[in-house]
């Protein structure tokens, strides 16, 4: 029901389903940390030409142009998929948040991984800060509703699948070198490996939503 960022946002809104999913995420990251400790590695990154690193950003720009200047791409007319901020506000907000996330090296899986392997809580502190800020916002605006049926949040209480789904995300994130947010940031920095990972996430999400 969402990436680790979405999970934390749901947690801050009082959604107990997200807290259940956190169990799976921590266990998945722990399993990945165990694999790293026992020698798992995808090898060292190597510099390539700049053109390969620009493929995904150019592709994303093309999708943005198609979404705003044509009717080729379909958009949801009802349900949660139809709710979004104005395009300009989304771009400005995304640029600000993306810059802060890049500078702080924000990574949800990395924070737990570093805490387990190196007893380093720097990245985890950033995640905790985000949670506290959003918790205060939700409390101040009356959006905080504690329970398994939080208004405005599309969720289910099938706890086994919540745990297993986020376990897979946590495990894969550690092996790939970063959570979905971190992969998106690295792809924007020019990482071809992360670009392939992001494309894989898009493809898998499309399969899950359409079949």
Sequence positions of predicted segments:
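Membrane-interfacial helix-loop segments of redox and metal-homeostasis proteins
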Residues: 1-211
């Amino acid at each position: 029901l969402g990436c680790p960022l979405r999970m934390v946002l749901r947690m801050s809104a009082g959604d107990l389903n997200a807290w259940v999913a956190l169990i799976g995420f921590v266990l998945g990251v722990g399993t990945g940390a165990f694999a790293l400790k026992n020698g798992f590695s995808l090898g060292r990154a190597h510099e390539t030409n700049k053109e390969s690193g620009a493929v995904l950003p150019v592709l994303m720009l093309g999708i943005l142009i198609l979404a705003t200047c044509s009717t080729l791409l379909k958009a949801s007319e009802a349900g949660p998929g139809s709710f979004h901020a104005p395009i300009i506000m989304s771009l400005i907000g995304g640029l600000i948040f993306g810059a802060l996330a890049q500078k702080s090296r924000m990574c949800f899986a990395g924070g737990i991984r570093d805490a387990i392997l190196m007893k380093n809580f720097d990245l985890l502190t950033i995640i905790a800060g985000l949670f506290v800020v959003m918790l205060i916002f939700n409390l101040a605006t009356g959006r905080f509703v504690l329970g398994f049926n939080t208004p405005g949040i599309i969720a289910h209480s099938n706890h086994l699948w919540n745990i297993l789904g986020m376990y897979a995300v946590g495990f894969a994130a550690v092996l790939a070198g970063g959570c979905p947010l971190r992969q998106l940031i690295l792809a924007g920095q020019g990482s071809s490996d992360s670009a392939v990972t992001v494309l894989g996430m898009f493809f898998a999400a499309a399969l899950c939503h359409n079949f």
